[in-house]
Amino acid sequence: MLIIPAIDLKDGKCVRLKQGRMEDDTVFSDDPVATAQHWVNEGARRLHLVDLNGAFAGTPIHKPVVEAIAKAQPELPIQIGGGIRSLETIEHYLEAGVTFVIIGTKAVQEPEFVEEACKRFAGHIIVGIDAMNGMVATDGWANVTDVKATDLAKRFADAGVSSIVYTDIARDGMMQGVNVEQTVNLAQYSGLPVIASGGVTNLDDVRNLKGQPGILGAITGRAIYEGTLNLREAQLLLDENRL
């Protein structure tokens, strides 16, 4: 299991939001490339990048920044989400050195797109499911749908998806702990590996996720930036008595 640092990009800066609200941001760095290097130095084995402006615009806004990070970290698996709505965008990111591309809103609006992407780019597609009270949210969390997160995950069980990034919006950026029950339930219901996101605050949250069936990793943002979680300590904890 991996602890994956999040680098959320807004207006060229590395920020953290609370519950996805663009107006409620905290800027942690003006240099995302240096931030990525910092987390690699701290032992990161994968990076989670989010183009926040892209998520709202429906098209990538931070391509040059993402490309620069990928170029600086050629050996490191990198996943990117936010504004990915076309096969051309996926191809561009993969050619630039990104390892995994996360499809979110488009997966809800057009599930067939995910299936086509998995055929074209096998092993490189992650579905991002963001949920409020178990219901899927889209367009940078601006719209909550009537689609259950578990049903959407199940829809892609046989599509060739690499994994699912599951974000509990109510917990995201709030430092209130991860929703272990919902995350594990999603993994068991879909049969797909799940990366937990939203609410990972301290080592207790990491312990609660460790060894849970179907959990591939956990994304953490505000906690490692504000110091309530030490990335290296968290990964060491997960590496102990690895199952």
UniProtKB/Swiss-Prot annotation:
<feature type="active site" description="Proton acceptor">
    <location>
        <position position="8"/>
    </location>
</feature>
<keyword id="KW-0368">Histidine biosynthesis</keyword>
<dbReference type="InterPro" id="IPR013785">
    <property type="entry name" value="Aldolase_TIM"/>
</dbReference>
<comment type="pathway">
    <text>Amino-acid biosynthesis; L-histidine biosynthesis; L-histidine from 5-phospho-alpha-D-ribose 1-diphosphate: step 4/9.</text>
</comment>
<keyword id="KW-0963">Cytoplasm</keyword>
<dbReference type="GO" id="GO:0003949">
    <property type="term" value="F:1-(5-phosphoribosyl)-5-[(5-phosphoribosylamino)methylideneamino]imidazole-4-carboxamide isomerase activity"/>
</dbReference>
<dbReference type="InterPro" id="IPR023016">
    <property type="entry name" value="Isoase_HisA-like_bact"/>
</dbReference>
<dbReference type="InterPro" id="IPR006062">
    <property type="entry name" value="His_biosynth"/>
</dbReference>
<dbReference type="InterPro" id="IPR044524">
    <property type="entry name" value="Isoase_HisA-like"/>
</dbReference>
<dbReference type="GO" id="GO:0000162">
    <property type="term" value="P:L-tryptophan biosynthetic process"/>
</dbReference>
<dbReference type="InterPro" id="IPR011060">
    <property type="entry name" value="RibuloseP-bd_barrel"/>
</dbReference>
<protein>
    <recommendedName>
        <fullName>1-(5-phosphoribosyl)-5-[(5-phosphoribosylamino)methylideneamino] imidazole-4-carboxamide isomerase</fullName>
        <ecNumber>5.3.1.16</ecNumber>
    </recommendedName>
</protein>
<dbReference type="GO" id="GO:0000105">
    <property type="term" value="P:L-histidine biosynthetic process"/>
</dbReference>
<dbReference type="InterPro" id="IPR006063">
    <property type="entry name" value="HisA_bact_arch"/>
</dbReference>
<dbReference type="Pfam" id="PF00977">
    <property type="entry name" value="His_biosynth"/>
</dbReference>
<keyword id="KW-0028">Amino-acid biosynthesis</keyword>
<comment type="similarity">
    <text>Belongs to the HisA/HisF family.</text>
</comment>
<keyword id="KW-0413">Isomerase</keyword>
<dbReference type="GO" id="GO:0005737">
    <property type="term" value="C:cytoplasm"/>
</dbReference>
<feature type="active site" description="Proton donor">
    <location>
        <position position="130"/>
    </location>
</feature>
